[in-house]
Amino acid sequence: MARFDVRSLPAVWTRELIIFKRYWPGTTFTAVLEPLIFLFAIGLGVGAFIDEIAGVKYVVFVGTGAVATAVLFSSVFPGMYNTFIARVFQKVYDGILSTPTTTAELMVGEASWVAARTAVYGSVPMMATIPFGLTPRWGMLLVPFICFISALGLTFLGQYISGLVKVIDSFSYFQSALLTPLLFVSGTYFPIDGLPRWFGTISNVNPVYHCIELVRDACFGTLSRASLWHVLALVVFAAITGTLSIRVMTKRLIT
C-alpha cells in the first residue's frame, strides 16, 4: 500500500493556492454564475406557474437544489480537466512525484483543495435564495461542510475519469452519459418521492441526491437521524472514488 502522510498535504495546498491566485476571477465567476442561472431561470421562471412544491416555495426548492448544482460543476470538472492537463500536457505531476510526495498524497491534496473552495461556491445559491423566501436558520452553517464532503467524492470521481481517458475530448461522453443524469436524477428541480420506485432506487446511489437532501434538511430545519444515512452515503462514496482515483493515477504515473 502506498505511503500516505497527512503532513505532505500543506505543500500540495500551497501550490494550488499560488496557482489559484492567478485565475480565481474566472473560476469563481463560472462557479457562481451557473447555479445562479439555474436558480433564477428555473426557480423564478417555473415558480411563476408553480407556487409550492414539497411544502415550500418552488424558488426555495430550486435554490437549495442549486447548491448541489454548484458542487457538481465546481468539483467534477476540475477533477477531470485540471488533472488531465497537469498530467498529460504540463507534466506537472512528474516533477511533484520526484519529491517525497506520493500519488495518494497528491490526489488527496488536490481533491481536498477543490472541495474546500467548492464549500464556499456551493453556499452562494443558498445565500441568494434568502431574499426569495428561504428562512435563515442555524442549520445553514452546516451547508459548507456538506458541500465539502460531497465535493471531495465528486472530485475523486473526476480524477478517476481523467485517468481512464486517453484524449481530452473523451470527457464529453462522461458529461452526457453520467454527469447530466446525476443532476436530473437527484431531486434538484422536482421531488422524487412521487416517482416510480426504480427512480428512487437509482437516486440512492447518486451522491448529488444525498447532497441535496442534507442541504435541504439543514436549510429547512428538518435534520434527523435519517440525515445520517445521507452523510454515510457521501462518506462511502468519497472512500470508493478516492481509492479508484489513487489506483488509476498510480497506474498512469508510476507503472
Predicted region positions:
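Hydrophobic transmembrane alpha-helices and immediately adjacent juxtamembrane helices
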Residues: 1-255
